[in-house]
Structure formats: structure tokens, C-alpha cells
Swiss-Prot record:
Domain of life: Bacteria
Keywords assigned: Amino-acid biosynthesis, Aromatic amino acid biosynthesis, Lyase, Tryptophan biosynthesis
Protein name per its UniProtKB record: Tryptophan synthase alpha chain
UniProt gene name: trpA
Catalytically driven reaction(s): (1S,2R)-1-C-(indol-3-yl)glycerol 3-phosphate + L-serine = D-glyceraldehyde 3-phosphate + L-tryptophan + H2O
GO molecular function, one term: tryptophan synthase activity
Presence of the UniProt keyword Amino-acid biosynthesis in the record: yes
NCBIfam families: trpA
Family in the record: Belongs to the TrpA family.
């Protein structure tokens, strides 16, 4: 039976709409983790498809400066993995949450304990950017009988056979990495990016979402045309932190029709 995240995103895709997933850093709020529910409900009310929730880490190798600074602010507010898990247990939302974490915080907490403790929460997906596919067995056995999907990240420089290997049996969605480098580095796209996205889209049997560097209306239109939707992180994190209006951008993303 498909996991909830797969079903919900497939339903959006079947309705002819683009999937939109914003990223937020847990604890990057003037209230710390006490402000997490407020941010989630703000985004939920705008109609987003799912929300990616980052766990702060002191050595975030895949994060650009905006998200790295958000993580440092969160850590300064006292955010810990344990405190985040306890907070997530109290949050009621109808949309799926996807945890983005480096492996070290997960390892320190205990993978099995982490998965068990999230069992009755809205968390339906898990992204671990520094966990190689060959080491997915460190996590996958603990997710097998749960409703949490392990999300594969696929670089668009990866050959088609390797792409197939990475996404075989995957649930939730495929995270297509649009740029070589860290998050937030917009505009530095390969000339053949659209072709590679279209190729990945053809071999995947779950939604393909494009992330890393997606930040403009033009990006939304471009990547919705060749994948099933987009993930936006740095633009959202910066706007929320600085109190900039972001509602119109999100509404445009949510309303995108295929």
C-alpha cells in the first residue's frame, strides 16, 4: 500500500496542478520551536502541498548561507532534535511534513527511536542529504512498516541507469537537485537541465520535484513544465526571518496549473 505522502502528492499531480513544497528551519523563529506550529499553519492556510522541516546542524554541507544562518539562529534558540520531536507530537496539520536532516543528528538520537517517536505525528517523509544510497540500509529497515518515506536525492549529472537504481522502490517523491552546489544558489543551471529533468521524469513512477536554487516566478514556470513541482527553501526562509511578504509568491506556486 502506498505511503500517505505518495498518495497525497499523486492526487495533486492527477488534478493537473503543480506540487509546491516550501522548506522551513525548525526553531528559526523569535519564539524558537514554540513558533513552529504558527509557521506550519501559515503555510498550510496558503495551500502548500507539503512542508519540509529542517533540523539544524552545525556542519550543514549541502546548505547555502541563508539556510546555514537559519540553522545557527535555531541552535542559538536552543533547538535540539529531542525538543523538535516533542514539538512535532503536539502539532496538528492536514498536510504531510517531511524532515530534512543530516545523518549525524539522526545517529545521535538513534534512528529506530527517531522513527518510533515520530509514528503518531504528521511527519510522512525523511530526507538525509549526506546519506549515500549505498548506506540507505542504515535507515530503511526502520521505515519499512511505517508511513514515513525515505526520499531519494538525484543529481541531474547522474546517468540514467544510476537514476533508476536510486529511485527503485522509492516512495513519496524524487528530489531532483537542479544545481551542482549548495542550496539557494539560483540561476546557475546546466544548459541541458530541462532535458535531464524530462529524462528523470520518464523513469520515475512517483512525483519528481525540483529543488536547490528555485527562487523566482520564472523558475516556478520552468520547472513545473518539466517536473511535477518545486521545492523552495532559501527564498522562504529569508522572507520569514526578515518579515518580508511571501504570500503572493506561494499563492502563485500553489495555483500553478499543468
Amino acid at each position: 500500500m502506498p505511503k500517505t505522502l505518495t498518495e497525497k502528492l499523486n492526487a495533486i499531480k492527477a488534478a493537473g496542478k503543480g506540487i509546491f513544497v516550501p522548506y522551513i528551519m525548525a526553531g528559526d523563529h523569535e519564539k524558537g520551536l514554540d513558533g513552529l506550529a504558527e509557521t506550519i499553519h501559515f503555510l498550510e492556510d496558503l495551500g502548500v502541498s507539503a512542508i519540509e522541516v529542517g533540523i539544524p546542524f552545525s556542519d550543514p554541507v549541502a546548505d547555502g548561507p541563508v539556510i546555514e544562518e537559519a540553522g545557527l539562529r535555531s541552535l542559538a534558540h536552543g533547538t535540539s532534535t529531542q525538543a523538535l520531536v516533542e514539538t512535532l507530537k503536539t502539532i496538528e496539520t492536514e498536510i504531510p511534513l517531511v524532515i530534512m536532516t543530516y545523518f549525524n543528528p539522526l545517529f545521535q538520537y538513534g534512528v529506530e527511536n527517531f522513527v518510533k517517536d515520530l509514528a503518531d505525528t504528521a511527519v510522512k517523509g525523511l530526507i538525509i542529504p549526506d546519506l549515500p544510497h549505498e548506506h540507505a540500509n542504515f535507515v530503511e529497515p526502520f521505515l519499512a512498516d511505517t508511513d514515513i518515506a525515505l526520499i531519494p536525492l538525484v543529481s541531474l549529472t547522474t546517468g540514467i541507469e544510476r537514476q533508476k537504481e536510486l529511485i527503485e522502490g522509492a516512495e513519496g517523491f524524487v528530489y531532483a537537485v537542479a544545481i551542482n552546489g549548495v542550496t539557494g544558489k539560483s540561476g546557475n543551471y546546466r544548459a541541458d537541465l530541462d532535458k535531464h529533468l524530462a529524462q528523470l521524469h520518464q523513469v520515475a513512477d512517483i512525483p519528481v520535484l525540483t529543488g536547490f536554487g528555485v527562487s523566482s516566478q520564472a523558475d516556478l514556470e520552468r520547472f513545473n513544465a518539466v517536473s511535477d513541482g518545486v521545492i523552495v527553501g532559501s527564498k522562504i526562509v529569508k522572507a520569514l526571518h526578515q518579515g518580508e511578504p511571501i504570500q503572493d509568491f506561494i499563492r502563485q506556486a500553489v495555483a500553478y496549473q499543468k
